[in-house]
Amino acid sequence: MKVILASASERRQELLKRIIDDFEIIVSDFDESTVKFNGDFSVYVQELAKGKAESVAKDIKEDAIVIGCDTIVAFNGKVLGKPKDETHAFNMLKALSGNVHSVYSGIAVLDTKNNNISTESVCTNVKFSTITNEKINKYISTKEPMDKAGAYGIQGLGGVFVEEINGDYYNVVGLPLNRLYKIFGDMGVNL
């Protein structure tokens, strides 16, 4: 059966290749602003992932498995998405400096054959070292943080700020492979 990843993220594509040899990429046009945050990060990311999977699946005319995913950083009860500009990135990184934050990913796996959908979320806690303003500005000048939730990439230069991680590393990168693999098994998807 065809597998479709509803994401433009190169990181997710690279991770998915570890468990699936052949898949298509169809970028979701889902309007994330239609999902309102109700205070529960886990539910929020699952709804975002579900919306992405469903927006791609509606146009698929054959049997397929569609994977939607969304990742956020949560700190002090707030969602830290991708930074709007360099000042926003600086403020995010300054807030995370010396503190623990949580990374949530929602996964939605939709089987178009029977319209069965499974959604789950994964949470990983990450502790940052204390970062000087100079180091934050130097990191921002690389442009790496500009397309990443929480303004850092653990798999890139931003990984040097990570002092400790409790949970799934791949979740912080953007696709919790272990949970996705389990969902496939529970849904009877043969890889």
From Swiss-Prot:
GO terms for biological process: nucleotide metabolic process. It catalyses: dTTP + H2O = dTMP + diphosphate + H(+); UTP + H2O = UMP + diphosphate + H(+). CDD domains: Maf (cd00555). Its cofactor is a divalent metal cation. Its EC number is 3.6.1.9. The record marks R11, T71, Q155 as: Important for substrate specificity. Pfam families: Maf (PF02545). Nucleoside triphosphate pyrophosphatase that hydrolyzes dTTP and UTP. May have a dual role in cell division arrest and in preventing the incorporation of modified nucleotides into cellular nucleic acids. HAMAP family: Maf. PANTHER family: BIFUNCTIONAL DTTP/UTP PYROPHOSPHATASE/METHYLTRANSFERASE PROTEIN-RELATED (PTHR43213), BIFUNCTIONAL DTTP_UTP PYROPHOSPHATASE_METHYLTRANSFERASE PROTEIN-RELATED (PTHR43213:SF5). This is dTTP/UTP pyrophosphatase.
